[in-house]
Amino acid sequence: MAREENVYMAKLAEQAERYEEMVSFMEKVSTSLGTSEELTVEERNLLSVAYKNVIGARRASWRIISSIEQKEESRGNEDHVKCIQEYRSKIESELSNICDGILKLLDSCLIPSASAGDSKVFYLKMKGDYHRYLAEFKTGAERKEAAESTLSAYKAAQDIANAELAPTHPIRLGLALNFSVFYYEILNSPDRACNLAKQAFDEAIAELDTLGEESYKDSTLIMQLLRDNLTLWTSDMQDDGADEIKETKTDNEQQ
């Protein structure tokens, strides 16, 4: 199947909300690239949307099951807890496979072939995101390894973003948003999370008048999410996370 046809099929799968198939079509596009070829902005966004939906459904399932597990444990329902743990393991296996799939794709072809600054940041941010999703449910040495890989990818992305992308660039802002969520949720460092989010927000505000019309909506939306998280984190550091922490859903369509 030609590249254009796979892209069209991916769009069709998105409309039908068949995201596993959308992933498959975009993987075919990604692996068929020549050594000097890159995904277009549209193609990389389609890949991101596909994986975000596939992983998002499992992340939501895992959170619900984990919450039920805690309740059953507190009630002393050991039989129920055993059933829940087995079911949670099944979801975790799916999460691992999805993350492994995109991380292999990023390391084998997408990151090495990226030439423009925004492409490099986009893919390194994506690498950080999927290691972070692993860190959300892994434990012990595996969690530590996932967290270290997340930090390494986000820092590499941040270095390029600070050097090559404007403070108002939606990809740079999206990176700051997700990096700050990593500090808060995975490393339990609310101070670092707040500092990173505030710096990104302040730097973008200072250059808001230079923002082009095409990315104005995306950039201001992520800035709002940064501010929402800052408000949440600073108002009550003791909050148990009852309110939803905001992170980027896709890079061209913040939700």
Curated annotation (Swiss-Prot):
Q: Which Gene Ontology terms describe the biological processes this protein takes part in?
A: protein localization; signal transduction
GO CC aspect terms: cytoplasm
Instruction: Enumerate the InterPro entries for this protein.
Output: 14-3-3 (IPR000308), 14-3-3_CS (IPR023409), 14-3-3_dom_sf (IPR036815), 14-3-3_domain (IPR023410)
Coiled-coil spans are none
Q: Which Pfam families match?
A: 14-3-3
- Which SMART domains would you find in this protein's record? 14_3_3 (SM00101)
Matching entries from PROSITE patterns are given as: 1433_1 (PS00796), 1433_2 (PS00797)
The similarity comment for this entry is:
Belongs to the 14-3-3 family.
Q: Per its record, how is this protein called by name?
A: 14-3-3-like protein B
Q: What organism does the record attribute this protein to? A: Nicotiana tabacum
Q: What is the lineage of its organism?
A: Eukaryota, Viridiplantae, Streptophyta, Embryophyta, Tracheophyta
